[in-house]
Amino acid sequence: NQIKKSNTSTGARIPKAMTNPADNFAGGQWKPPGRRSARTSATGMFVCEHCLRAFTTNTGRGLHIKRAHEEQANEAITTERSRARWTNEEMEAVQAEIDCEGRTAINQEILRIIPYQRTIDAIKCLRKQQKYKTIRERVANRRAENRARETELTRLETADEDPASQEQDNPNMSLKNWLKEVIESDDDRLCADLRTAIEMALAGQSPLDVCTVGCYQYTMTNLPLVPVRLGGPIYWCNAQSRSNPGETQRRQTIKESNNSWKKNMSKAAHIVLDGDTDACPAGLEGTEASGAIMRAGCPTTRHLRSRMQGEIKNLWRPISNDEIKEVEACKRTAAGPDGMTTTAWNSIDECIKSLFNMIMYHGQCPRRYLDSRTVLIPKEPGTMDPACFRPLSIASVALRHFHRILANRIGEHGLLDTRQRAFIVADGVAENTSLLSAMIKEARMKIKGLYIAILDVKKAFDSVEHRSILDALRRKKLPLEMRNYIMWVYRNSKTRLEVVKTKGRWIRPARGVRQGDPLSPLLFNCVMDAVLRRLPENTGFLMGAEKIGALVFADDLVLLAETREGLQASLSRIEAGLQEQGLEMMPRKCHTLALVPSGKEKKIKVETHKPFTVGNQEITQLGHADQWKYLGVVYNSYGPIQVKINIAGDLQRVTAAPLKPQQRMAILGMFLIPRFIHKLVLGRTSNADVRKGDKIIRKTVRGWLRLPHDTPIGYFHAPIKEGGLGIPAFESRIPELLKSRIEALGASNMQTARSLLGGDWVAERKKWINTQKIKNSEWAQKLHLTTDGKDLRDTRKAEASYSWIRDIHVAIPASVWIKYHHTRINALPTLMRMSRGRRTNGNALCRAGCGLPETLYHVVQQCPRTHGGRVLRHDKIAEQVAIFMQEKGWLVLREAHIRTSVGLRKPDIIARKGQDCKIIDCQIVTTGNDIRIQHERKIQYYASNWELRRSAATMIGHQGQVSVEAITISWKGVWEPRSYCLLRDCGIPKVKIKGLTTRVLLGAYLNFNTFSKATYRTERRRTAN
């Protein structure tokens, strides 16, 4: 039997005669081919021992095993060494473990620490090497620096400041002086209640009374409040609507879905895409279990009186107006239990400063500001497990505003460990994921050992001890007044748990930070800094000149080491550090990955038979093909996996939901596509996959908007300002976002992140970016170069030309909104449109007998059948403009007939307001010529006639100059910029100008509809040029 070679000449399939197991028996015994089997005597082929596939070369067989049998290929790698080799991490660990000062028998001590595959002679040779001496000096210098730092910190914490310096630098003195200046200034903007409170404060009365009189009474009595509603899931239809049959049920369902959309667009979109993830059994079980976690803790430290040296005292300086305006309360944030809205709070700008400074002077705030409601957001539907809830505390708007100012002040001093990349002004997600990807790639390329531990901390934000927060603030040298205030807030705060419209009872948390409070992320980072200090400095993965021992993003910890012993030491240290802060790891949710080099074979093996331990519990060890997620990016042992854009199912759910096309487009652009952006940018993908995803989206949108199949591709992806639909294209968006995030690494304050720019990982990503076939900015040009899209090239010049497209609140009926798009992109079925690609002479002439090609422009703007519609459209626009101007106080004269020496002139509008008088004429023009030229021609038509201007002034009762203006709009709703500016200068709001645009488009579609239904044919026949 002869074997036919494959096209690649690297492999062939064994004929059936060869794959018969009996062929491998010799003398009654089975003889399987070896891992490096030689050529078979009969065929001269190399056979795979796993699937019996034959190859012409041994290299081809090896590549086949590596790709088709990954697990078997990984297990076949041998990592055992004939003799031990010393790594830099191991030498630093040994030197850090022993104390060389005044000790003897150091060689025996080293042998005791690392007994495996080591001898006394080997240790002696190692200690004579210059590399070991350099490491010994570096370890000694690091130990000396740490000792000096700890000594200084202990001295600052135990030593009190000199009383004279305390009095001179006391932050409260500057606050007291500021309050005196406010009282003496007689500022009218200061209300009586607040003035009384400041006077009481300066008189030394009770802080609680001062805060109650000055802060709470003023804000509660003088600001409008809103009732606080319990949050809950949104349902598309209730039980009653399900019982209604047929058309009634459909209408009721659509009505309720539209109401849900208006109440909470984001939640309604998530229900469409994910189902009702907020739904869970009603009752107080979830609130009681979560409340038990918050109440379990040690008593909070009481008021501190001793000040430590080196405090950053300017953190407690008086608050300025610039700071208040810089972090003004967001208008979209929810109100707290007191019902105060952000709009009301931001309206008392000068009083806010006085309130905040008085709070700082006393170190306390009104107790009602401390009350919050904690909404438990379930991570999984139907759960009652406390670990599966995400608590979000919503306190008073005033307290959140004040704490945001304090958080900004602390953040400006750079007090946090640079390894912590969460809640800072940096792209921490991109930095950490890129570093992890780069380290895995370097370990495989350079055959280096890499051990990774992905840790999960149990309810980290809810479990941190309050005493740990206080210790962390002391280490960061925050002033005594700020520390006392923060601890007073945590000692006196109350909250009420809410889950799915169910209220729990008021509780006083004894542990955890207040998630939702602007200060909480910074406080948690300070606590995590204490945990990171426990990591051994000699352990980590050496990448270039930097050693990376951990990647940290809030409570997401990834530990790295070059040796197994190094990673186990880091795990033990981190476990001890977390326990000191009242935190604990969840071993069942932790994972480790061991990439072990094989020096002889020049390969990397994923080991799984030697697990790591945390708290005497083994951690799950990831295998060769196992996957895990870190910061939203899915990894395996080779790095980020290839991301598939599985968007078809989500699009089908959006299509099946009872939504209007405007709502579907909003969900697509605002919620669905952004779900894929993160993992596509930071993960891996291919050009073929992103183009396939774009094709699926375009196909679905064509169905939603009933667009023909040959609609220009640029119309889907061009920005709305350029006349398109503004749908982000994966093909162009992903490479540009990846490029911008890579460039941002160069501005990072972390040296290891900046060093990535010269590495292999970034070079590989840049190489893929350069394969980009179209840029994001080229979609507009792609649209404007087509026959259907060239008329939209001036859209960006006036906001009214495109503002109607994003109609997320469904102000325009759905069927009409679709027809507007058909009109703009020439999608209405004219003969010229329908005969594309199969047109012959004469078969596309106008059905009205005009003798001209039946284009959409001809039907709407030229054909005699639609003349009456064009007149009505023009008159309606002029009428609406006149009404809008009258509403703004203009005296308007409509369609005045003025006879001049050159003939009768009938300007649409003559308007006067004060000393301003205008002659305005409206026109709806074609876009074939420059719309600017047509606009100037219309103005010149009236401006050159001095008799017209004089008669118009006389008719309207004006004595001064008369200006001539024109309102020029194309029949596709594109405005001439000066026309738009004219109406805005006249005081007409944008929303009404947008209505003029849609009225023009509606008139164009009605003209086409009239043309299609009419049977009138003109007697005068013309032939096309």
Curated annotation (Swiss-Prot):
GO MF: endonuclease activity; RNA-directed DNA polymerase activity; zinc ion binding
Protein origin, superkingdom: Eukaryota
PROSITE patterns associated with the record: RT_POL (PS50878), ZINC_FINGER_C2H2_1 (PS00028), ZINC_FINGER_C2H2_2 (PS50157)
Alphabetized UniProt keyword annotations: Endonuclease, Hydrolase, Metal-binding, Nuclease, Nucleotidyltransferase, RNA-directed DNA polymerase, Transferase, Transposable element, Zinc, Zinc-finger
Gene3D superfamilies associated with the record: 3.30.70.270
Domain Reverse transcriptase: from-to ranges: 358-635
Feature: compositional bias, Polar residues: 1-11
Enzyme Commission number(s): 2.7.7.49
Compositional bias segments (type: Basic and acidic residues): 146-158
Stated name of the protein: Retrovirus-related Pol polyprotein from type-1 retrotransposable element R2
Annotated source species: Nasonia vitripennis
